[in-house]
Amino acid sequence: IQNVSIAPISHNLQVFLIMPALRLITGGESHGKAIISILEGLPAGLSVDLDRVNSELSARQSGYGRSGRQRIESDRVEILGGLRHGITTGAPLTLMIENRDSANWTHIMSSTRPDMNDPAVLAALEAKKIVRFRPGHADYAGTLKFDHKDVRDVLERASARETAARVAAGAFAQVLLQALGIEVASHVVAIGAVSSK
């Protein structure tokens, strides 16, 4: 949303705004400690129910085709900044979703340099090294772009797990749209030759 003038939105946001574009940055790896979202451009004064955000994360986890990892993770958003007492402050909204499965990947995903003189460490790293690309993913392009020797350095970001960060940020964007009187809805019109009436 670029430079939109907004009338008083709700009893929680009794101001006129010139709203800049929303900007989303995500970070973290699939098997790292956490996935992070930073959503910049939300106005101050939006009332947000974190149960609603967590409900969106829960719906994401129950989607068709989810991996067995969904039984390990129980996605809950933790606010690191930009929200105080349930009200946005206008600062960049910083969200974290912990990866519980990271406990099983501490040596493989460590941010510190491993002891390359330790044969056990070398064996563990070599055993988890990925050299084959997943079809239809960013693995090949990312490995070429960044000149990685281990595909894991790409696939940890190009993972379905990263969508948790987008879903959490999207729940906050929905709150903003609703404050503006905008509702988003969808339905399937047709699948192949079968259409709804």
PLM feature segments, named:
Residues 17-197:
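Generic N-terminal targeting/processing segments that precede catalytic cores or assembly contacts
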